[in-house]
A protein has these predicted regions:
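Active-site lining segments that contact anionic ligands and/or coordinate catalytic metals
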Residues: 253-255, 291-293, 351, 363-365, ...
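Structural boundary/hinge residues at secondary-structure and domain interfaces
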Residues: 2-125, 129-161, 205-240, 251-362, ...
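Long, C-terminal catalytic modules of enzymes
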Residues: 413, 432-433, 439-522
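Short, hydrophobic/proline-enriched secondary-structure or compact coil segments at domain edges
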Residues: 123, 176-177, 245, 250-265, ...
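Extended, charge-rich low-complexity interaction segments
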Residues: 74-80, 183-184, 328-330, 421-440, ...
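Single conserved position on a long alpha-helix in the C-terminal lobe of the eukaryotic protein kinase
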Residues: 44-46, 93-207, 345-456, 515
Length: 522
């Protein structure tokens, strides 16, 4: 895409960044003018508002004020402008945000993607930007084109002048600037302005957006049904039709919340089973040591893997994937005598957790925790796996742990793998110390699930059930040390970020998700 279009797209992308754009992206009631111009066959739609609302402005101002260098509210506007300007400068586009963009930029920016040549997997994206001063916008676009050495040809479509080049086009449709990769996308918006069906008129779009929190910073809509049909995954995603999400500023962090209607009568048996498990909060976090810095819990992992394999089999080039999986099964069977489907998958049929607490030399320290549907059958399957590994040359010993016996396997060219079983939970680690740490955390009640940082993260999320993830951002940055080369100001800002959390609860007839990024007090 030529320099002008890249410049506008870059601006829109920068405006969508969580904290910088967060200062601007403040909800402006119900006047979504861009959705009224987006084509009805759009498969995705992202929208942000630049008009402040008092509650969101207060929360965002407080969050940004916690970051190093942003504590002075009087100069907050200037500092945010400077950061945006620096980012544009780093892009190499030669744009001056204060002089060339900010004076004409209105209160709304949106992007809609519609099928190119009827293929939803190859959407033709158009950007719809509200303009508060068209004369300034036209002058700025002309200046940007001159700076880039590009020339445009004017053509008229349904009474609207479109400026076109080999790799991009733009037009003013009323008070909106429409930018596309080609004139086709721009023409589709003009068609809507002249009476063609709009995304805003779709019942599923209105229903999805009405289900989002009213006071938000930005919103998104995805036509899952169209994408599933186009990608050959309609059977696996038959229970889903659309999805929507909203970005919200809370007092202690930024929250992205969304949902997708779930038609259980249309779902496959495995999808329905996985959905049913998502209504309960994870219990495995009560076994993870308090110093855990990152964790992931998945409910129904077995069902997810089986669904993914079925989807791969029906996808283009899926035969290569299924053939590779068959090879893995054969190697496990002939090399170790392990039947993956009978011995390993039953361990993953309910709740699976991974916890990371640090790096010990070249290997991570942490645990894999399993709470299977049938603990006794799963433990028997685990014993079979151990017996077969011992039969192929591994050595086995046992140690006493806090409340449970720990079995340690030493496998040539692999190292040590330890495990213990207690209260229906299987704990695995790369050594007895990791397993013992989990047993001790549960016995003492000093586990991650009871820590303040974990509790605060999911308090901002407002929910905790189903699949989840947690990352202590500051601890991870400290752990990585000099591994990442970051500017000092970026490292200071990351140090002020508290944690990331994600949860995906099942609620009645919908699947929700909530992702949060917290910001610590100075």
């Amino acid at each position: 895409m030529h320099r002008l279009v890249v410049a506008l797209v870059t601006l829109i992308g920068l405006t969508g960044a969580v904290f910088l754009a967060g200062y601007f992206l403040l909800f402006s009631a119900s006047n979504d003018r861009a959705a009224a111009l987006a084509p009805a066959d759009s498969v995705f739609y992202f929208n942000v508002y630049l008009q402040p609302s008092s509650g969101q402005q207060m929360n965002l101002g407080g969050l940004i004020g916690r970051l190093p260098g942003f504590a002075d509210e009087a100069s907050l506007d200037e500092k945010v402008d400077q950061v945006v300007q620096n980012l544009l400068g780093a892009s190499g586009l030669g744009l001056d945000y204060r002089e060339q963009i900010k004076p004409w930029l209105g209160s709304q920016i949106a992007v809609a993607g519609r099928p190119a040549d009827g293929d939803p997997t190859q959407p033709d994206a158009v950007f719809i930007v509200e303009v508060k001063d068209r004369a300034l916008a036209e002058a700025a676009l002309g200046e940007l084109a001159t700076q880039g050495g590009f020339s445009f040809t004017a053509e008229t479509y349904q009474g609207v002048e479109i400026q076109t080049a080999d790799t991009g086009a733009y037009a003013f449709v009323g008070e909106m600037l429409v930018v596309g990769e080609s004139s086709v996308g721009v023409e589709s918006v003009i068609d809507v302005d002249r009476g063609a069906a709009a995304l805003a008129g779709r019942e599923d779009f209105r229903t999805t957006m009405a289900g989002l929190p009213a006071d938000h910073l930005a919103s998104a809509f995805v036509d899952l049904g169209a994408l599933a049909e186009a990608t050959g995954t309609a059977d696996q995603l038959s229970a889903f039709s659309t999805a929507g999400a909203a970005l919200i500023a809370e007092r202690d962090g930024i929250r992205l919340s969304g949902s997708a209607p779930f038609e259980i009568d249309d779902a496959s048996a495995s999808s329905a089973a996985g959905f049913g498990l998502g209504g309960e909060p994870s219990s495995l976090v009560d076994w993870m040591p308090e110093d855990t810095i990152a964790e992931l819990v998945i409910f129904g992992l077995r069902q997810t893997l089986e669904d993914a394999e079925d989807a791969a089999a029906s996808a283009p080039d899926g035969e290569q994937i299924t053939s590779a999986l068959d090879t893995v099964r054969a190697l496990a069977s002939f090399g170790f005598g392990i039947d993956i489907d009978a011995d390993l998958l039953p361990l993953l049929d309910r709740e699976v957790g991974i916890a990371l607490s640090g790096l010990g030399g070249a290997l991570p320290s942490g645990q894999i925790l399993l709470r299977p549907e049938d603990p006794e059958a799963a433990e028997a399957a685990l014993v079979r796996v151990v017996d077969r590994l011992v039969a192929t040359g591994a050595s086995e010993r046992t140690e006493e742990g806090p409340g449970a016996e720990i079995t340690v396997l030493s496998i040539s060219q692999v190292g040590e793998i330890a495990y213990a079983v207690r209260d229906g939970v299987i704990i695995l680690g790369l050594g007895a110390e990791d397993v013992s740490a989990a047993l001790q955390a549960h016995a003492d009640g000093r586990a991650l699930g009871g820590s303040d940082r974990y509790a605060q993260t999911f308090e901002v999320a407002g929910e905790r059930a189903g699949n989840e993830a947690f990352v202590d951002i500051g601890a991870v940055v400290d752990l990585m040390g000099a591994t990442f080369e970051l500017p000092d100001d970026a490292r200071d800002i990351l140090a002020q970020i508290g944690s990331f959390g994600f949860t995906a609860p099942s609620r009645d007839d919908r699947l929700e998700f909530h992702a949060v990024l917290t910001v610590d007090e100075p």
